[in-house]
Amino acid sequence: MEQFVHSAWSMIPFGLMLLTIAVAPLIAEHWWESNRHKLTVALFLGVPTAICLIVGGMLHDLEHQIFGDYIPFIILLLALYVITGGIHLSGDIKAKPWVNTTFLALGWVLASIMGTTGAAMLLIRPVLTTNQQREHKVHTVLFFIALCANCGGLLTPLGDPPLFMLFLRGAEFTWFASMWAPWLLTGGLLLAIYFALDTYYYNKEHWTAISADHREHTPLRIYGKLNFLYLVGVVLTVAFVNAGVIPQMGEEHAPMWIKYLREIILVSLTLLSFYTTKKKVRFELNKFSWAPIVEVAVLFFGIFTTMTPALAYLNANAASLGLDATWQFYYSTGLLSSFLDNTPTAVAFHSVAAGLTPDQMAAFGGNLVAGVPEVLLQAICLGAVFFGAMTYIGNGPNFMVKAIAEESGIKMPSFFGYMFRFSLIVLLPVYILVQLIFL
């Protein structure tokens, strides 16, 4: 048993967990819809792994993974999910190219503040309503996925789950803002491409569609404004309630309420949001459901448990894996983030970077951030966040946006259609340019 947890074989449950998440929705969609079935898979792979870890002398590693990573991770996602689920933006304005581009730019900026899921869910319905009279609108949803559900969430650990995990591993809250240049270049290029493309399609619209769009006009209106205050509370809590600011939170024998002070505050903000937001806003206008966050909690229990021995193996054998260039970390993280979940992918490559020898680390120069060379951490962050937009399964909000668009009557591209008609020809060249300039 001890030999298993310290060998490459220990990575099999982790690989099977990620493979199931990636493949099951494609080959057994109806069966996979049930959270009970997801829980079955998580327990089937997670419980035996946990037993092996305990017997193999890695109980401390398992405890750290569950109590130090999993619980804070899920509580943050719960807070963002509930609070943003209490904000509703409605209205129908003219779907001119500059209006659509403004919507996408707003979501791109908000993604770093309220998370990619929050920004996407806040804006996707107003975008679809605004464009309902237009015939050509698939491209708007595709760029929405790229900008609002992925690329925008780079500047804070709230933006995308992999960034929060790297924050828990020692990267400072403000460090993520240092990636503003690739964030700005990527967003600026995608917005410029979108504006040109939307202008082209707008000029191709039949005059009846344009006329209908001009006639049907409803001013924008925001419901649940109090939740913006709770959202500010989340940002301040993550930024200032941590061991870096309050050293007692990191002490081994500190009281539980001190260790989990951040989580206690986040849960309090979550409850305030839930009980002070009108049910009509949350459940009728936003069609709020607990199912998505339950799904995340269930799947990530399996991911975090099976990931424990895999991370230990990668860290111990990092020097022999042959990753010795920044671009290799960028594209390796990006490739796996495209088809697997980007959070465990980012954590795995952080473990690889942390396991490099001192001489290997010195070759990258610069400061160490979260225990790894800064340029490698940037490569991992950029690869995880940006490449999540390469497929529908690269990041959680992608499928949610696709489903809402299809409910509105938009015929979205297939899994491979999305890649060959959009991500490979539009996104990948931009990502390559980012690597050439910054990495």
Feature locations, PLM:
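Interfacial loop-to-helix junctions that mark the boundaries of transmembrane helices
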Residues: 1-10, 31-40, 60-72, 173-183, ...
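Intrinsically disordered, low-complexity non-transmembrane regions of multi-pass membrane transporters
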Residues: 1-20, 45-49, 198-231, 273-291, ...
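Juxtamembrane and boundary regions of transmembrane helices in multi-pass small-molecule transporters
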Residues: 31, 155-156, 165, 174-222, ...
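Transmembrane alpha-helix boundary signature
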Residues: 49-69, 81-96, 109-122, 308-317, ...
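Alpha-helical transmembrane segments
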Residues: 65-77, 175-193, 253-268, 332-338, ...
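Membrane-interfacial helix-loop connectors
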Residues: 111, 122-135, 140-142, 165-181, ...
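Transmembrane helical segments that form the transport core of multi-pass membrane transport proteins
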Residues: 231-356
